């Protein structure tokens, strides 16, 4: 009977755990919908700003902002690492951290040092354990990204690039593909890249420049600030949508596994109970026969 009591305790414990994971699954599903709405609302703007910046990188404008000039003499690169503040989201953070480590190695093989900005507590903890130099950080963002909280930490890297102290600035985050799939990506933020310089049909587009009014410097200075803000905000929005999707899937898997464990324990309990009853009946029958 002691074994049966222990099994009942295990069943109760797993049932309580399943209630928690089921509740977390439902909360994550609700947050996921809101995060996806924010991400999808911001994505067209970010894509258009990225395309404009790509055109500018291929053109020969009358004014060239520091963000458009490659700092070939700099021996240090910057990486903005976007992760979550919380765990329980499957391999989401692991994948982007693995990609970041690979980027660190690639840059170091080229003789470049790396300085990082951490957005999210998980990334900050990893960078500290990894021994990377963290120049700025943002944690506890909550469920809604706010640009005013983000841009201060990112501006540290932008200022260093403008001063010619960084050779490039990259941003690492998890891009949302769909509810079941998210992918870790690392994009070059600075100098302006022409990677997205394509026509609508995917073929290389023709290079051309814009007409700037009232003057090129005023427009370009403002535009490139918006470019950085848009890409950083979009990266965080994509990462948050990916986080809630991954957490919902992970908690659903945990709930399903808990249900399986409960069924298996219930079967073991029933077998133990049946064996105990059979033993008692055998003892009663044996006693009656002896009398």
UniProtKB/Swiss-Prot annotation:
Keywords: ATP synthesis, Cell inner membrane, Cell membrane, CF(1), Hydrogen ion transport, Ion transport, Membrane, Transport
Record InterPro entries: ATP_synth_F1_ATPase_gsu, ATP_synth_F1_gsu, ATP_synth_F1_gsu_CS
Pfam families, A to Z: ATP-synt
Protein location: Cell inner membrane
Main location group: membrane
Keyword presence, Iron: no
Membrane topology value: Peripheral membrane protein
Record-level Gene Ontology MF annotations: ATP binding; proton-transporting ATP synthase activity, rotational mechanism
Gene3D superfamilies referenced in this protein's UniProt entry, alphabetically: 3.40.1380.10, ATP synthase, gamma subunit, helix hairpin domain
General function of this protein: Produces ATP from ADP in the presence of a proton gradient across the membrane. The gamma chain is believed to be important in regulating ATPase activity and the flow of protons through the CF(0) complex.
Quaternary organization: F-type ATPases have 2 components, CF(1) - the catalytic core - and CF(0) - the membrane proton channel. CF(1) has five subunits: alpha(3), beta(3), gamma(1), delta(1), epsilon(1). CF(0) has three main subunits: a, b and c.
Family: Belongs to the ATPase gamma chain family.
Full protein name: ATP synthase gamma chain
Organism: Burkholderia cenocepacia (strain ATCC BAA-245 / DSM 16553 / LMG 16656 / NCTC 13227 / J2315 / CF5610)
Source species taxonomy: Bacteria, Pseudomonadati, Pseudomonadota, Betaproteobacteria, Burkholderiales
Recorded name of the encoding gene: atpG
């Amino acid at each position: 009977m002691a074994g049966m009591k222990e099994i009942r305790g295990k069943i109760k414990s797993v049932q309580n755990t399943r209630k928690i994971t089921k509740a977390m699954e439902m909360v994550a599903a609700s947050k996921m919908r809101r995060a996806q709405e924010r991400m999808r609302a911001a994505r067209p703007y970010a894509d258009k700003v990225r395309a404009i910046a790509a055109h500018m990188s291929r053109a020969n404008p009358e004014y060239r902002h520091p963000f458009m000039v490659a700092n070939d003499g700099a021996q240090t690169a910057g990486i903005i690492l976007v992760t979550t503040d919380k765990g329980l989201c499957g391999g989401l953070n692991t994948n982007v951290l693995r990609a970041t480590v690979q980027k660190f190695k690639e840059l170091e093989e080229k003789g470049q040092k790396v300085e990082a900005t951490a957005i999210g507590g998980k990334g900050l903890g990893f960078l500290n354990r990894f021994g990377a130099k963290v120049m700025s950080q943002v944690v506890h963002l909550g469920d809604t990204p706010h640009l005013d909280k983000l841009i201060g930490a990112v501006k540290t890297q932008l200022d260093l690039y403008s001063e010619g102290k960084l050779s490039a600035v990259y941003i690492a985050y998890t891009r949302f593909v769909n509810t079941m799939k998210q992918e870790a990506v690392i994009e070059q933020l600075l100098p302006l890249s022409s990677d997205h310089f394509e026509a609508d049909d995917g073929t290389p587009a023709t290079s051309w420049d814009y007409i700037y009014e009232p003057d090129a410097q005023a427009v370009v200075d403002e535009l490139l600030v918006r470019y950085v803000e848009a890409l950083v905000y979009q990266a965080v929005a994509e990462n948050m949508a990916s986080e809630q999707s991954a957490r919902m899937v992970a908690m659903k898997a945990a709930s399903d596994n808990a249900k399986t464990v409960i069924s298996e324990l219930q079967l073991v309990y029933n077998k133990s109970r049946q064996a105990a009853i059979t033993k008692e009946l055998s003892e009663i029958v044996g006693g009656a026969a002896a009398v």
